[in-house]
Amino acid sequence: AAEGGLKYWKLAGTWLEEERAEYRLARSLLQAQNHASAVAHAERCVDVCIANNASPFERFFGYAVLAIAQLRGGDRPACAVSRQRALDQYAMVAADEKQWCEAEVNELRS
């Protein structure tokens, strides 16, 4: 379902929907224990954010899912870099948006 969502958001949506669909697909792949594919889609999520000068809120989620995927895939050095990038973006997230980041922040800090 997540792959279908990505396909159709790329056709009908903006970069924001594509980025969020990449995030959702990475999360789904993590649930399926497909860590390598999760890393690839998380990297694409981050790439879309960078290419479109996304807000810290969007970048936070990209780097967070990337760090989580890298950790579960056993790449601790890459995870440490992505984790720090996620937390750096989180520090710049608007106060009224931080509540939406709590689950990922807790996951990064555990």
How would you label these PLM feature ranges?
Residues 2-10, 43-51, 84-95:
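Amphipathic alpha-helical segments of tetratricopeptide repeats
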